[in-house]
Each structure stands twice: as C-alpha cells, then as structure tokens.
Design a protein with these regions (language model features):
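Glycine-rich active-site/cofactor-binding loop and its immediate structural neighborhood
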Residues: 71
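N-terminal leader/linker segments that precede catalytic domains of diphosphate-processing enzymes
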Residues: 1-66, 76-93, 97-128, 169-189
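Hydrophobic alpha-helical segments
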Residues: 74, 87, 114, 120, ...
Length: 189
C-alpha cells in the first residue's frame, strides 16, 4: 500500500493529476509535488419519512435539481453531525418540522451521483410545519393523496413504498434499492 501523505495546507491549482497511485487499483487525484492523495468519496444524504398520525410530510422543492417536484425532507450530511442529527436538521431547514427519529428505514446507493442515502422513519412532534428556504410549500398527505406523478426522485418513491409496506411493524428490514435500480432520473428537469 502506498504511504499516506499528510494533506497540504493549501494545494496550488493545477498541482493534482489523476492517476492510479502505486499499490492502489483506483484512479485518484495525486499531488505532483508531495504525493498527497485526495480521495474522492461518496456524499452522504440524510432524510426521513416524517409522519403525523397517518399523514406523511412532503416538501415541494424550490431548488434544482427537480425544482417544483415533491420530496422528503433530506439533504447532505454536514461535518461533525450524526446521520440522525442531520435528518432532524434537514426536517427543520426544509419544513420547519421538529421530529423524533424512530429508526433507520432504508439505505440507498445512487451510483450515478456517488451518493449513499440514509432515510429514517420519524414522527412529527407537532403538525405545525412551514416551508423553509429550499421549499416552495410543504404538506401533510394521506397515502392516497400523495402526488406520485410529481415525486422528485426514485429514492423518494422507494422510501415511501418501503415505509408503507413496513407500517405498523417494529421489526421491518432496512430497505435498499429495488433490484437493478440505481436512482437514475432526468437531471435537466
């Protein structure tokens, strides 16, 4: 295995080249001057299926991609927070919703975007919700009223379906991508 170099304080533009470091099998960004390897890793997305009784919280996106489409409160995990703390933060940022995390619902791998999504099952502490800066509007939906044709991403549909199939069960298995599905959608929409 190649010797691990410490991160340079500031790497001047253009000093990294893409190559397979000695002892590795993947193409990496390697500093030409010091040999530091800048590992590019998947991004972690955290979110939750939040409920108030039988109703599910959805947020209509005010940002791209998929502006105007409905999603779960979710977003990128921040440094120095747990995944559950990130899911709580995202619920507040997108829907001004205070939630109690109940249990991990699903883990999805979105290969095209190099994402790992951790989706929790959560309970709203109050039905008082409001659109945050990244949402046009928010709403509580009965299962039959979910705007399925306007769902933003395949993983949102998967999470909702898994939540519905696990409803009332404490021992449900953690969900994952449906066989052969990797979360592709039309990014230009």
């Amino acid at each position: 295995m190649a010797e691990m170099k410490e991160s340079p304080t500031v790497a001047p533009a253009g000093t990294f080249e893409r190559r397979v470091p000695e002892g590795d099998s993947q193409s990496r960004l390697v500093c030409r001057d010091c040999g530091f390897i800048n590992y590019e890793n998947p991004k972690v997305v955290v979110g939750s299926v939040c409920t108030w009784g039988e109703q599910i919280l959805l947020c209509r996106r005010a940002i791209h991609p998929r502006s105007g489409y409905w999603t779960l409160p979710a977003g990128y995990m921040e440094l120095h927070e747990t995944s559950a703390d990130g899911a709580r933060r995202e619920a507040w940022e997108e829907a001004r919703a205070s939630i109690e995390i109940e249990r991990l619902l699903a883990v999805y791998n979105i290969l095209r975007l190099s994402q790992v999504q951790l989706i929790y099952r959560a309970r709203l502490l109050s039905p008082d919700i409001a659109a945050g800066p990244e949402s046009i509007e928010v709403g509580l939906f009965d299962w039959g009223a979910i705007p399925w044709q306007d769902i933003a991403f395949p993983s949102v549909r998967w999470a909702l379906d898994h939540y519905h199939s696990a409803a009332g069960r404490a021992d449900y298995p953690v969900g994952s991508n449906p066989p052969g599905e990797w979360g592709n959608y039309e990014p230009g929409l």
